[in-house]
Amino acid sequence: MAKKLVGSMKLQVPAGQANPSPPVGPALGQRGINIMEFCKAFNAKTADMEQGAPCPTVITYYQDKSFTMDIKTPPASYYLKKAAKLSSGAKTPSREVVGYVSSKQVREIAEAKMKDLNATSIEAAMKIILGSARSMGIEVK
C-alpha cells in the first residue's frame, strides 16, 4: 500500500550547511520529521554544490514520519549577484544600475538553471535570466 501523504513544505537551506538549529530544526520538528536524518541526507545530496549557496528545497512528508526532498538549483538572483560581484540588488532597479554582467555569464547561469526553469531552449532560459537581472538593476553588456 502507498504511503499516506501528510503535506509538503518549502525551505531555503544553504548547500552543505543544514543543521538542527533554527530555522531548519523547528520547521521540521513540528511536522514530526527526523531532523538529523534530513540534515545528513541534505548535506550528502548537496556535497557537490558550492557550499553556502541557498538551495530551495521542497520536502514532502508522510504519515509514517518518512520524507522525500526535491532540491532545486540556487535562485537566479544568487548567480547574478555572484557574477556582478554585488552584495544586493538595486533599491530602485528601473532608475539605478548597480552592476554589469556579460551575455556569456547570462548563458552560463541559464545553463545552470535550465532544469528548474520553465523553458524549452537555452535562449528562452536566457530571457528569463535577463528579466531577473533587469529587476535587480543589473545591466547586460
UniProtKB/Swiss-Prot annotation:
One of its GO terms (biological process) is translation. GO terms for molecular function: large ribosomal subunit rRNA binding; structural constituent of ribosome. InterPro entries: Ribosomal_uL11, Ribosomal_uL11_bac-typ, Ribosomal_uL11_C, Ribosomal_uL11_C_sf, Ribosomal_uL11_N, Ribosomal_uL11_N_sf. Keywords: Methylation, Ribonucleoprotein, Ribosomal protein, RNA-binding, rRNA-binding. The keyword Transport does not apply. One of its GO terms (cellular component) is cytosolic large ribosomal subunit. One or more lysine residues are methylated. Belongs to the universal ribosomal protein uL11 family. Part of the ribosomal stalk of the 50S ribosomal subunit. Interacts with L10 and the large rRNA to form the base of the stalk. L10 forms an elongated spine to which L12 dimers bind in a sequential fashion forming a multimeric L10(L12)X complex. Forms part of the ribosomal stalk which helps the ribosome interact with GTP-bound translation factors. This is Large ribosomal subunit protein uL11. It comes from Roseobacter denitrificans (strain ATCC 33942 / OCh 114). The lineage of its organism: Bacteria, Pseudomonadati, Pseudomonadota, Alphaproteobacteria, Rhodobacterales. The gene is rplK.
